[in-house]
């Protein structure tokens, strides 16, 4: 490995960490503004009704989910729809960390403590535009820029690893 290759790899890792941090910030704000949709079927419904309002789509799966044929078909359809409608899309490689981020907020709600139901489907997460000027967010801009640059390099669905805390 040459010095240039080592330096390039180090820069890529640092950039991915920054993108992961930006994604955490976007999800945190989306949760607080209630502009988030969780679940494959719920996401498909929203994409069917109001695709112009969706600013980011996250797909999350681990190794076990890679063998779920039905889930992979849903992912393929959602990816195709997002690409056709210019919706930024990312794949999250550690759904456990995504669950920590999203369930932290929902566990605090009174509805979460009423019944111990099945855990929510976190395989697909949509972030929508809140129709406010507050959404001029540098973290979201960073994610959109990352998605655009990835598409230029023919990586239509870039994979993000959320940093562990």
Curated annotation (Swiss-Prot):
Short name of any one Pfam family annotated for the protein: Ribosomal_L7Ae
One cellular component term from this protein's GO annotations in UniProt: nucleus
Annotated SUPFAM superfamilies: L30e-like (SSF55315)
Modification sites for Phosphothreonine: 2
Listed InterPro entries: GADD45, Ribosomal_eL30-like_sf, Ribosomal_eL8/eL30/eS12/Gad45
Any one GO BP annotation for this protein: regulation of cell cycle
Keywords: Cell cycle, DNA damage, Growth arrest, Nucleus, Phosphoprotein
Functional note: Might affect PCNA interaction with some CDK (cell division protein kinase) complexes; stimulates DNA excision repair in vitro and inhibits entry of cells into S phase. In T-cells, functions as a regulator of p38 MAPKs by inhibiting p88 phosphorylation and activity.
Family: Belongs to the GADD45 family.
The name this protein goes by in its record: Growth arrest and DNA damage-inducible protein GADD45 alpha
């Amino acid at each position: 490995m040459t010095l240039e290759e080592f330096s390039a790899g180090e820069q890529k890792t640092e950039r991915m960490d920054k993108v992961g941090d930006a994604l955490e910030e976007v999800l945190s704000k989306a949760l607080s503004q209630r502009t988030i949709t969780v679940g494959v079927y719920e996401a498909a419904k929203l994409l069917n009704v109001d695709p112009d309002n969706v600013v980011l789509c996250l797909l999350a799966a681990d190794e076990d989910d890679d063998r779920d044929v039905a889930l992979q078909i849903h992912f393929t359809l959602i990816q195709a729809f997002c690409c056709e409608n210019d919706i930024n899309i990312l794949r999250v490689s550690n759904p456990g960390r995504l669950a920590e981020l999203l369930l932290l907020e929902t566990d605090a709600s009174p509805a979460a403590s009423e019944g111990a139901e099945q855990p929510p489907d976190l395989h697909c997460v949509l972030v929508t535009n809140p129709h406010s000027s507050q959404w001029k967010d540098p973290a979201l801009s960073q994610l959109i820029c990352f998605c655009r640059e990835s598409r230029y390099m023919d990586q239509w669905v870039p994979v993000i690893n959320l940093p562990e805390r």
